[in-house]
A protein has these predicted regions:
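Short alpha-helix plus adjacent loop in nuclease-associated cores
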Residues: 76-90, 141, 146-175, 231-233, ...
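Noncatalytic, basic helical substrate-engagement surface that gates or grips nucleic-acid strands
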Residues: 2-135, 139-163, 240-243, 249-257
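Conserved RNase H-like, two-metal-ion catalytic cores of nucleic-acid enzymes
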Residues: 6-9, 13, 19-59, 75-76, ...
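Conserved catalytic core of nucleic-acid polymerases
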Residues: 525-528, 637-638, 644-645, 649-652, ...
């Protein structure tokens, strides 16, 4: 493309809206409840396209009505497609209103598809001397590619795109030029559009035939030379091939036009766009759009890019520069200012080590870089002791005397207290005052716990209303672009005040200051403690399980009558179970690839009646245990012979901790295989495992929060709660409650906590919907206070948009406003559950901090080494077991005063498996 020609982007509106709808979770809604996830994704892609290509003009094409033009040629064209999802359909008028506010022309014509409008615009634009960018996810558009028409092909998600030029089309199709793409589809067909093509000819064979003969016409002319079944199909379906090519050919004569000279972008009113975005509740993008224009929005645009402060770098060995930086940091510490700290090891992606380690510090005076030297120094500069290195010296004083802000405070603590306990510890994390640390990602998480990522662009846009400048090494970065870690440090400092303000407004400050920040040093200490694992035991278990897996595989293949299929392939497994063996498919859904699902739910339902399915589930469990734990835990051991999990505070929407690398919380607890894995974890010599677990904490919280007199009395009198529920629900004396009735009552008790409805209960107990509904109704009759409480929780959540815990941890639930009944039902169940599950998460976190403090204050040699949901695990010297058990239970049972007692139960064992 030429640099001198004007560039126009023509967006395939239907393609991008469909892609956005399926890529962005359906939890985004306008204030009035209308779904907006497709609009959000569309606008995100729109802005990325503008940033990447800076077109002089933008237009958007949409389908309008049925595709009359192609249906006249092929009546079954797209006939197999299901109706558009109502939530997606509802968003098309809204995106068109937004595009109108953005002054972006909308092109559509009755009976014509957006593809043909893109084709027409490509021709008209090229004739007008413009370079054209066609933004679409449809590969058949590649036929339009020329020197001055490129296709911006959206691929995975919304951000992965490929720029298709004549050369790249040729490479993709192995010698096929853009003009021959319709010929390619003439042979291959297109199942998504119901275009038949020639049976048995896929993309590789279609490419090979056209490359060999030069065109579809020549392939047909030489059809007698094509051997075998493919030749037979070709000769029998010549008319289908010619028709398919015709249908796949993009028209360039749609009845649309555009004045290219008069069309430009951006050319919109800041007020109109702000109002349109505000109506839909998509305010986070407002400044990204305003940054595109001048005029009234110009002031906003001028200040909308985050400015990186001036930088001062102290290179390794430069004593004068080091002294100057140390003086500035000392001043910030003495003044009680927040100092943002980020360590950068300058390593390439995938590398273990970088060439240079740099500590970036941001203060109110600017941005400072301290490079690590090669050796230790005995120098004490301005109150900093650099005996263990520059980075350690600065961080130690910052943590002990200053106020530290970081996007990952725990990782920063590990600079001084390494995860591998065989490495020397320079500072005990518990010595840090939690009121003097501020983790920006944890703060952002508390404000939006359903969000999966808190990347810097999102944080800057949401809390500073600014765009980030490109960092060094990124596409579009200028020569003096900041290092990524430098930008992170500057942004972190800038975020402290607005995040603190937002937390105060959202009632999240108490959770942040009282629960989450005190927990950070505790988690750092637990991660360093790690868990001792026996590699020989793991190896032995793995070998034994491998033998069992082989035996199960043999049994599966014998029952299937197929020695070759891949049991681990969902597609091949589906074929064997449903096509070959004829297992029932009633009620089963097919995947996008056209085969029946073989997920755990499907197989569990079938397992009751089919031995092969039971064996497949057994094979899956054994294979997962072997690959996920037995074969991977050994290599994860550090120099101290221990594995060190990482605790995550910002992953779960409920507030619970999660663990990773390895995930020790997900080892199955009720499975014999899971117990087997835990036998490889042992306490050190002279020590045992101590496990202390809350008993029925969520049910006890339900009793407290609902105030139901029968529920409260049952717990206060120490009754068998599940038996008591069975007696009340089934109308029998407690003495006559059978194990089956108790089991059913237990399922109802825990199901109610999770907002379970009749369908869920019927599935878990394998009973009819009517019976499940009757059980739930009788439960609410037995405990009327529970029904009132849950109804009030849902009503309040619908009014406020969130549910919250006893401690004020909020979970925003946009699904409550969804028009889709299933999503709305999920939102209601989430609202019911959060007060209990979220409060339980808060309580265990508070207990962890208090237990940790008592361990230090009372001189225990024991270490808290693991947290799994409602359980704390310790490695404890044998002579401390009784004292530690008493202390931990005392702390856990008195975190909070409830209407019912909190009960913590303890057990010990030589291995983790024994401590149950």
């Amino acid at each position: 493309m030429s640099d001198k020609r004007r560039t126009f982007a023509v967006i395939d509106g239907n393609s991008l809206m469909h892609r956005a709808f399926h890529a962005v979770p359906p939890t985004m809604n306008a204030p009035d409840g209308r779904p907006t996830n497709a609009i959000f994704g569309f606008l995100n892609m729109f802005l990325k396209m503008i940033d990447a290509f800076n077109p002089d003009g933008v237009v958007v094409a949409f389908d309008k009505g049925k595709p009359r033009v192609r249906m006249e040629m092929l009546p079954q064209y797209k006939a197999q497609r299901p109706p558009m999802d109502p939530d997606l359909h509802a968003q098309f008028p809204m995106i068109k209103e937004l595009l109108t506010a953005l002054n972006v022309p909308i092109l559509q014509s009755e009976g014509w598809e957006g593809d043909d409008i893109l084709g027409t615009m490509a021709r008209l634009g090229e004739e007008a001397g413009c370079d054209m960018l066609l933004v679409t996810g449809d590969r058949d558009m590649y036929q339009l590619v020329t020197e001055h028409v490129n296709v911006v092909s959206t691929r995975k998600g919304l951000s992965d795109v490929a720029i298709m030029t004549p050369e790249s089309v040729d490479d993709l199709y192995h010698g096929i030029t853009p003009a021959l793409v319709p010929d390619f589809y003439g042979l291959k067909g297109d199942t998504s559009d119901n275009i038949p093509g020639v049976p048995g000819i896929g993309p590789k064979k279609a490419s090979a035939l056209i490359a060999q003969y030069g065109s579809l016409d020549e392939v047909i002319a030489h059809a007698d030379e094509v051997k075998g079944k493919m030749g037979e199909n070709l000769r029998a379906h010549i008319d289908d091939a010619l028709l398919s090519r015709k249908v796949a050919t993009i028209r360039t004569d749609a009845p649309v036009e555009l004045d290219f000279e008069a069309t430009s972008f951006p050319a919109f009113s800041a007020d109109e766009v702000s109002a349109a975005l505000g109506t839909l509740g998509i305010t986070a993008m407002q400044n990204r759009f305003l940054a595109l224009i001048g005029g009234e929005g110009g002031a906003a645009a001028a200040s909308s890019v985050f400015e990186i402060p001036a930088m001062v770098r102290a290179a390794a060995g430069d004593a004068d520069a080091l002294g100057a930086v140390a003086a500035e940091v000392s001043h910030a510490i003495d003044a009680g200012e927040w100092v943002a700290a980020v360590v950068d090891d300058d390593k390439e992606e995938g590398a273990l080590f970088g060439l240079t380690r740099t500590l970036w510090l941001a203060t109110s005076k600017g941005l400072f870089a301290l490079e690590e030297g090669d050796g230790a120094s005995t120098a004490v500069v301005d109150g900093f002791n650099f005996a263990h290195g520059v980075i350690a010296g600065v961080l130690a004083r910052l943590f002990m005397e200053g106020r530290v802000a970081s996007p990952d405070t725990k990782a920063l603590l590990h600079e001084l207290s390494p995860i591998d306990s065989s490495e020397p510890e320079l500072m005990d994390p518990l010595a840090v005052d939690s009121t003097c640390i501020f983790d920006t990602v944890v703060a952002a998480y508390l404000l939006d716990s359903d969000r999966s990522e808190f990347d810097e662009a999102y944080l800057a846009d949401t809390y500073l209303q600014m765009a980030l400048p490109a960092a060094r090494g990124a596409e579009g970065a200028c020569e003096d672009a900041p290092a990524p870690a430098a930008r992170t440090a500057a942004l972190t400092l800038a975020l402290v005040a607005p995040l603190r303000e937002c937390m105060a407004r959202e009632n999240a400050a108490n959770v942040f200051d009282g629960i989450e920040m005190p927990l950070v040093p505790v988690l750092a200490k637990m991660e360093r403690a790690g868990m001792l694992v026996d590699p020989d035991r793991l190896h032995s278990l793995s070998e034994g399980l491998a033998t069992q897996i082989t035996e199960v595989e043999r049994s599966i293949r014998d029952l299937a009558g197929d020695e070759t299929f891949n049991i681990g392939s969902p597609m091949q497994l589906s074929h064997v179970l449903f096509d070959v063996m004829g297992l029932p498919t009633k009620g089963l859904k097919k995947t996008k690839r056209g085969y029946y699902s073989t997920n755990a739910k499907v197989l569990s339902d079938l397992a009751r009646d089919h031995e092969i399915v039971r064996l497949i589930l057994d094979w899956r469990e054994k294979s997962k245990i072997k690959s996920t734990y037995l074969d991977t835990l050994g290599p994860l051991r550090r120099g101290d012979g221990r594995v060190h999990t990482t605790y995550n505070q910002t992953i779960t929407a409920t507030g619970r901790l999660s663990s990773s690398d390895p995930n020790l919380q997900n080892i199955p607890t009720r499975s014999e295989l899971g117990r087997t894995v835990k036998t490889a974890f042992s306490a050190g010599e002279g020590s045992v495992f101590l496990a202390v677990d809350y008993s029925q904490i969520e049910l006890r919280l339900l009793a407290h929060l609902s105030g139901d007199e029968h529920l409260v009395r049952a717990f206060n009198e120490g009754e068998d709660f599940h038996a008591e529920t069975a007696a009340r629900v089934f109308g029998v004396p407690v003495s006559e409650v059978t194990p089956d009735l108790r089991s059913r009552a237990k399922a109802v008790n825990f199901g109610i906590v999770y907002g379970q409805q009749a369908y869920g209960l019927s599935q878990s107990l394998h009973i009819s919907m009517a019976e499940a509904r009757d059980m739930i109704d009788r439960y609410y009759e037995a405990y009327p206070g529970v029904r009132t409480f849950l109804d009030n929780v849902v009503a309040r959540a619908k009014q406020t948009g969130y549910a919250e815990t006893m401690y004020g941890r909020r979970r925003h639930i946009p699904e409550l406003k969804a028009k889709n009944p299933q999503l709305r039902g999920f939102g209601e169940r989430t609202a019911m559950n959060h007060p209990m599950q979220g409060t339980a998460a808060d309580i265990i976190k508070i207990a962890m901090a208090r237990v940790s403090r008592r361990l230090e204050e009372e001189g225990f040699a024991a270490h808290m080494i693991l947290q799994v949901h409602d359980e704390l695990d310790f490695e404890c010297p044998i002579d401390e077991v009784e004292r530690l058990t008493t202390m931990v239970r005392d702390v856990m049972e008195h975190v909070v005063d409830l209407h019912v007692p909190l009960i913590a139960e303890a057990s010990t064992g030589i291995t983790w498996a024994d401590a149950k």
